[in-house]
């Protein structure tokens, strides 16, 4: 057993097929890219963890359980790699606050950032989402994220603004649980003369 691990931390999902195709695919890529490290999994949603345990007898650690397991296994280096899109409540309270309690218990325990932090991160995401599909001006392309009550939810507004600045006027960003919500996006789309709407997820996985 190696003394170096990468702990891939996701919100989690109770949909088994979906989990394998999304979180599982990310974990597989990380595992293949860093062969000197053992890849391990943790979820931040205790509700998802409980459902999987009760329904499927599938045990998945939360962050604290994963770190306790690493300590028991004699691990010295733990790289925390979140799959979260932004530094919202899950990232701060479920990951950073938990990891802070273990700073002195490992030789090295760095925390990677979520997807959207720097302007370059936004540029990369825009390049990715606008390169998928060939949509004309008659088509509104709507991306929906989960959303968050945290201040970091502003990433969606920033992303919308940068898309407009780059001339992607038919691209719209909304959220399921925050702002801009369904009604906000619908109002924006109605301002255009579109014949077709394409709805896409801006999230890693369904919950």
Where are these regions (language model features)?
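Active-site-proximal alpha-helix that buttresses catalytic centers in soluble enzyme cores
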Residues: 1-207
């Amino acid at each position: 057993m190696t003394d170096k691990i990468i702990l891939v931390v996701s919100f989690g999902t109770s949909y088994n097929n979906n989990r394998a195709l999304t979180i599982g695919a990310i974990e597989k890529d990380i595992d293949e890219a860093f062969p000197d490290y053992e890849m391990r999994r943790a979820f931040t949603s205790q509700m998802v963890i409980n459902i999987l345990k009760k329904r499927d007898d599938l045990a998945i650690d939360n962050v604290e359980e994963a770190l306790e397991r690493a300590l028991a296994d004699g691990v010295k280096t733990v790289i925390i790699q979140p799959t979260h899109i932004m530094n919202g409540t899950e990232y701060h309270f479920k990951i950073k606050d938990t990891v802070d309690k273990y700073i002195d218990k490992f030789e090295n325990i760095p925390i990677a950032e979520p997807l959207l932090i720097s302007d370059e991160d936004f540029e990369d995401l825009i390049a990715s989402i606008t390169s998928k599909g060939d949509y004309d001006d008659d088509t509104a392309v709507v991306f929906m994220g989960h959303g968050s009550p945290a201040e970091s939810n502003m990433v969606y507004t920033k992303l919308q603004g940068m898309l407009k600045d780059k001339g992607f006027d038919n691209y719209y960003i909304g959220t399921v649980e925050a702002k801009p919500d369904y009604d906000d996006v619908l109002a924006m789309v109605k301002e255009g003369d579109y014949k077709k709407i394409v709805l896409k997820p801006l999230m890693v996985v369904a919950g």
